[in-house]
Curated annotation (Swiss-Prot):
It is found in: Cytoplasm; Cytoplasmic granule; Cytoplasm, Perinuclear region. This is Pumilio homolog 2. Residues 777-781, 923-927, 1002-1006 are annotated as: Uracil-nucleotide binding in RNA target. The lineage of its organism: Eukaryota, Metazoa, Chordata, Craniata, Vertebrata. Sequence-specific RNA-binding protein that acts as a post-transcriptional repressor by binding the 3'-UTR of mRNA targets. Binds to an RNA consensus sequence, the Pumilio Response Element (PRE), 5'-UGUANAUA-3', that is related to the Nanos Response Element (NRE) (, PubMed:21397187). Mediates post-transcriptional repression of transcripts via different mechanisms: acts via direct recruitment of the CCR4-POP2-NOT deadenylase leading to translational inhibition and mRNA degradation. Also mediates deadenylation-independent repression by promoting accessibility of miRNAs.
Length: 1066
């Protein structure tokens, strides 16, 4: 009964969370937020309570507090203080309120150290909350969470939430973005706190406003204020609290809301040990061991949160069990309510649960072995924290540290080495071992293999966020026992193992095993490895090993982790080949290059495995398919992981970005292992999960922007002396980047032939893609400009067959133009390219991009090869001449084609001269004939203009043609045009006067003054002189006066007796 009563107290603590320590006075201006009720939400208090739940360190930086969450979790901002909103929890709340511990023993010290009225920095009000960003992309709107909390969840079970807990209790909340009590709240409300560092509220801490990384830089102590240092004690009781959690490097969305769980990813050295009294510790252990139904308390996230933030353990459920079903619940040891599986990322089999979902086997085994394991810890006085920074090797839990997995299962796996494959071998595959989907990647990029929990082959895979995965000591020992029997490389025996104890880390060495016992399984093939081939590494450096069959990518890269026939525990070995260390080559640089692979080699990793098991790897929305679903409901990676528009799915053997490049499973994981450790590291130079491309940069290093790390560093000016040879494997990617394309263009101009050939080899396979790329097309053009003849012809052959689509494409048309300029027209490939336009001439001519290609063809190709263009223009000259793009092509024909070809074009032009001169585009064609045409063609046009000079000169477009007529006509024709203007009358005034005032015709008059013979110029002057005073009133008339002044000031004798005006003024 004592345990039951305590379980109720642990489960429901909404009011007790705040009532003992909440301040009810308000020193600030009460009218700041308007008139509100007496008892308001916690946004109304000047600062939060002294409770540890509101401590600045209990809540991650840049995480918004849930607006309006007051004394109980789902209250509105102006709600009156009242018992629980649901009647079901009223009695619990009353008991909790009565039995809540008095804070009197802590208030004094807080008042002594607190500085009331001055701590604005600690305020978590809406002003502060609005300025914070969201730590997770999955964080939902705060107000929407408040409004939908009761409506959406109250129908799942009797208590209102799928977890069997009140909506008021925020310790276990599957809604991202909501506030969750930190483990320190659990401790403080359970009873007296033995650690004075826990439970302290806003204090005048000099480090309070610094980043959390600085605050917890010391793993032993927590800087509370300037007066005292409080040390952290290790656990003192028989509870399996000696787990080593790993910090997640990204914003994690797991089973719990991590907004206020500081252990997971906000600290460099997470304070994972929450201090409890000895009595409470013993009660936890006894409750877990003796009463299975108390596991519901642990599943609610209360007790385990005080010890382990959120690791994952392998459940004992049968293969393919869906945790949403009753079978999954039974396997997870009678959780309190259905187990909620949150939105997750990476492929993990069903049955891998957070460690907080306690299991009976783990509880019993942990209770029995905790005291025995305590003596073997590497550092007894300090909880070890695994957080691999940049350049560090990934740490793993040591052999002495035990987890909350089901040790009994691991022992069973050790006793029966073929447990992991038992069902698979029994279902029609005797003697052919296929790895069940028990491997996945954790947040460090390491390959994690389930300890025999997934015994079937067809178990569905779920998506999991990059959160820690724990390894139990029993699993390690079981694997060691299995390896001792010669069945597989063990966790302790193999120096290349994925998981090895922290305390025992021998130097990296090649481990040879008898070939008779080394029956190895890779993810994509099964092969019997000999002594010359120790194991199939996940991404092997060397060429293909004898006897290995790689089903994924060719050229001998055995793309599978060499998992032994007995997968008991974590008996896996990812080692490099002993026979190929001297012949190391660039990873995936030849046959599996980005654009060289055929469609067959582009099969997604793991696709043969899933398809053979009736589980399709085709893309589908992110979800968690049930075991009963048919193929086609596979899992897909987050969209950001596909940078080349690929539709490849997320697969077991490795993450791909859609183009065959391997990427780490965890966001940010590539930064941790850039500089790899040389001892016992998966990411070392001799045994690497992701081998580097050029000593440092992995093809797996895909930044969040979708660019590789090399390109990202180059864009950030981290490589001022980058050379073309440094871009091997990245030429295409750089060509498609604005800055990278410019860099390659500049280098190609001064590159050696060998360097140009290296670049050319990479871009040739992606030539068409680069031709249509906004930046890549310039690299192709550079090769047409600076490449050798063979390179130019090779690129031209890539254009063949695609001339029309390229000609109509914005960037492809530029490539074709450059090719036509750079390659001699007598080359056969050029003639073939031009011939592809036959039948599509008019379409190209009227296209904004294609017309440039046709123009370039006319300019660069021999006219005899262009007769099909002339034939296409027959009967279309007037239409094309009045077209914005067609008029340009007509002009090119008039310039470059033979007389025989241009004659029919000119005949059609002369038939429509009067319309063309007044057209906004056709007038350019007529002007072009006047400038470059034959004299007879010019005379025809001038004869069309004569008699209409006055009218056409006042036209916006025709006035330009009249000017050209005056300029390019013969002397006799020009005299006739000028006489027409001078002698013609327009009403009471001469035509000259009208033209001088017109906005367009005045330019014709100016041109006549310039081009006229001296005798005619004198006549024009006499005609203009009477109108000088009037012309001053008109804007355009002033242009004529300026022209007259020019000639008068010359005092030219050509003016005769005219001289200046009598008054000396113009």
């Amino acid at each position: 009964m004592n345990h039951d009563f305590q379980a109720l107290a642990l489960e429901s603590r909404g009011m007790g969370e705040l009532l003992p320590t909440k301040k009810f006075w308000e020193p600030d201006d009460s009218t700041k937020d308007g008139q509100k009720g007496i008892f308001l939400g916690d946004d109304e208090w000047r600062e939060t309570a002294w409770g540890a739940s509101h401590h600045s360190m209990s809540q991650p930086i840049m995480v918004q507090r849930r607006s309006g969450q007051g004394f109980h979790g789902n209250s509105e901002v102006n709600a009156i203080l009242s018992p629980r909103s649901e009647s079901g929890g009223l009695g619990v709340s009353m008991v909790e309120y009565v039995l809540s511990s008095s804070p009197a023993d802590k208030l004094d010290s807080r008042f002594r150290k607190g500085n009331f009225g001055t701590r604005d920095a600690e305020t978590d009000g809406p002003e502060k909350g609005d300025q914070k960003g969201k730590a997770s992309p999955f964080e939902e709107d705060q107000n929407r969470d408040l409004k939908q909390g009761d409506d959406d969840d109250s129908k799942i079970n009797g208590r209102g939430l799928p977890n069997g807990m009140d909506a008021d209790c925020k310790d276990f909340n599957r809604t991202p973005g909501s506030r969750q009590a930190s483990p320190t709240e659990v401790v403080e409300r359970l009873g007296p706190n033995t650690n004075p560092s826990e439970g302290l509220g806003p204090l005048p801490n000099p480090t309070a406003n610094k980043p959390l990384v600085e605050e917890f830089s010391n793993p032993e102590t927590q800087n509370l204020d300037a007066m005292e240092q409080v040390g952290l004690e290790s656990l003192q009781f028989d509870y399996p609290g000696n787990q080593v959690p790993m910090d997640s490097s990204g914003a994690t969305v797991g089973l719990f809301d991590y907004n206020s769980q500081q252990q997971l990813f906000q600290r460099t050295n997470a304070l994972t040990v929450q201090q409890l009294t000895a009595a409470q510790q013993q009660q936890y252990a006894l409750a877990a061991a003796q009463q299975p139904h108390i596991a519901g308390v642990f599943s609610a996230g209360l007790a385990p949160a005080a010890f382990v933030p959120n690791p994952y353990i392998i459940s004992a459920a049968p293969p393919g069990t869906d945790p949403y079903t009753a079978a999954g619940l039974a396997a997870a040891a009678t959780l309190a309510g259905p187990a909620v599986v949150p939105p997750q990322y990476y492929g993990v089999p069903w049955g891998v649960y957070p460690a907080n979902l306690f299991q009976q086997q783990a509880a019993a085994a942990a209770n029995n072995t905790a005291s025995q394991q305590a003596a073997s810890q590497a550092q007894p006085g300090q909880q070890q924290v695994l957080r691999a920074g940049a350049g560090q090797r990934p740490l793993t839990p040591n052999q002495g540290q035990q987890g909350q997995q089901a040790e009994s299962l691991a022992a069973a796996a050790a006793a029966n080495p073929t447990l992991a494959f038992g069902q698979g071998l029994a279902t029609g595959m005797p003697g052919y071992q296929v790895l069940a989907p028990t491997a996945y990647y954790d947040q460090t990029g390491a390959l994690v293999v389930g300890p025999g929990a997934r015994t079937g082959l067809g178990a569905p895979v779920r998506l999991m966020a990059p959160t820690p995965v724990l390894i139990s000591s029993a699993a390690a020992q079981a694997a060691a026992a299995a390896a001792a029997g010669g069945t597989a490389s063990s966790l302790t025996g193999s120096t290349n193992g994925l998981f090895r104890p922290i305390g025992t880390q021998p130097p990296q060495q090649q481990q040879q095993q008898p070939s008779t016992n080394l029956q190895s399984n890779s993810f994509y093939g099964s092969s019997s490895l000999t002594n010359s081939s120790q194991s199939s590494s996940l991404f092997s450096h060397g060429p293909g090993q004898p006897g290995s069959t790689s089903l994924g990518f060719g050229s001998g890269n055995s793309l599978g982790a060499a998992i032994g026939s007995a997968l008991s525990g974590f008996g896996s070995s990812v080692g490099s080949s002993a026979s190929s260390s001297a012949t190391r080559r660039e990873s995936l640089s030849t046959s599996s290059d980005l654009y060289k692979r055929s469609s067959s080699s582009l099969a997604p990793i793991g696709q043969p495995f899933y398809n053979s098991l009736g589980f399709s790897s085709s893309p589908s929305p992110i979800g968690m398919p049930l075991p009963s679903q048919t193929p086609g409901h596979s899992l897909t990676p987050p969209p950001s992981l596909s940078s080349h528009g690929s539709s490849s799915s997320l697969h077991l053997g490795g993450l791909t970005n859609g183009s065959g490049r391997y990427i780490s499973a965890a966001p940010g994981a590539e930064a941790k292992y850039r500089s790899a450790s040389s001892t016992s590291s998966l990411f070392s130079s001799s045994s690497q999960l992701f081998p580097p491309s050029r000593l440092r940069y992995n093809r797996s290093d895909i930044m969040p922007s979708g660019r590789s790390r090399l390109l990202e560093d180059f864009r950030n000016n981290r490589f001022p002396n980058l050379q073309l040879r440094d871009l091997i494997g990245h030429i295409v990617e750089f060509s498609q980047d604005q800055h990278g394309s410019r860099f390659i263009q500049q280098k190609l101009e001064r590159a050696t032939p060998a360097e140009r050939q290296m670049v050319f080899n990479e871009i040739l396979q992606a030539a068409y893609q680069l031709m249509t790329d906004v930046f890549g097309n310039y690299v192709i053009q550079k090769f047409f400009e600076f490449g050798s003849l063979d390179q130019k012809l090779a690129l031209a052959t890539r254009i063949r067959g695609h001339v029309l689509p390229l000609a109509l494409q914005m960037y492809g048309c530029r490539v074709i133009q450059k090719a036509l300029e750079s390659i001699s027209s007598d080359q056969q490939v050029i003639s073939e390219m031009v011939k592809e336009l036959d039948g599509h001439v008019l379409k190209c001519v009227k296209d904004q991009n294609g017309n440039h290609v046709v123009q370039k063809c006319i300019e660069c190709v021999q006219p005899q090869s262009l007769q099909f263009i002339i034939d296409a223009f027959k009967g279309q000259v007037f239409v094309l001449s009045t077209h914005p793009y067609g008029c340009r092509v007509i002009q090119r024909i008039l310039e470059h084609c033979t007389a025989e070809q241009t004659l029919p074009i000119l005949e059609e032009l002369h038939q429509h001269t009067e319309q063309l001169v007044q057209d906004q585009y056709g007038n350019y064609v007529i002007q072009h004939v006047l400038e470059h045409g034959r004299p007879e063609d010019k005379s025809k046009i001038v004869s069309e203009i004569r008699g209409k000079v006055l009218a056409l000169s006042q036209h916006k477009f025709a006035s330009n043609v009249v000017e050209k007529c005056v300029t390019h006509a013969s002397r006799a024709e020009r005299a006739l045009l000028i006489d027409e203007v001078c002698c013609q009358n327009d009403g009471p005034h001469s035509a000259l006067y009208t033209m001088m005032k017109d906005q367009y015709a005045n330019y014709v008059v100016q041109k006549m003054i310039d081009m006229a013979e001296p005798a005619q110029r004198k006549i024009i002057m006499h005609k203009i002189r009477p109108h000088i005073t009037t012309l001053r009133k008109y804007t355009y008339g002033k242009h004529i006066l300026a022209k007259l002044e020019k000639y008068y000031l010359k005092n030219s004798p050509d003016l005769g007796p005219i001289g200046g005006p009598p008054n000396g003024m113009l």
